[in-house]
Amino acid sequence: PYYRAVSDEVEMYEAAYEARMPVMLKGPTGCGKSRFVEYMAWKLQKPLITVACNEDMTASDLVGRYLLDINGTRWQDGPLTVAARIGAICYLDEVVEARQDTTVVIHPLTDHRRVLPLEKKGELVQAHPDFQIVISYNPGYQSLMKDLKQSTKQRFGGLDFSYPESDVETEIVAHEGDVETEIADKLVRIAERSRNLKGHGLDEGMSTRLLVYAAQLVGKGVDPMAACQMALVTPLTDDPDMRDTLSAAVNTYF
């Protein structure tokens, strides 16, 4: 997978992996957190198990449960247990979406013990030496209800992500969207304008992911104005005035 390093995050992650330190990635949506984890798993030649967290997720969804089949009941390992057994990197995406009582099950895996108790089964899984846990979340829209407990936060080393510098972002958009640098540069300038509106009518500026979408549409022969409308303006907001403002920014460059 393609990943363009922005600062020293690759070296820092490698050092954390050597120490088998659990890692927390913080940053806005679409800034490359998940791609970074995929890239690091590929670089370290380790399997990656990704779990998209949601508020309906229970501890059993992570750890495992008994299932009924023709022969009676059998135990089915959850993704966290599988990762701990085989020595994979387990990536919990948007971990604040999960309920706090669910995230507590990772505690024994993220300190010196490195074990996972399967209470229903009466088994204690000793984590494989290669096992590591990575979580990510967006610190921008946490409420008091949806934040990590201090007891969870203080088990992780943290890496901060944000949108790259404009020249780096241009390079990423040109590569991923397969368009000329000139188009990518204009898209990045539009995004920078939208990011200045964060907190003034927008919850979040245009992400690098949206810029790549717009670039891909342009690459497929779509008119740049229409591509920006579809990929950048429409998904971002429902407010008509805000849309006009964003469309004006698009018109400035295309």
Language model features with spans:
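AAA+ P-loop NTPase catalytic core and its hallmark functional loops
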Residues: 1-185, 189, 252
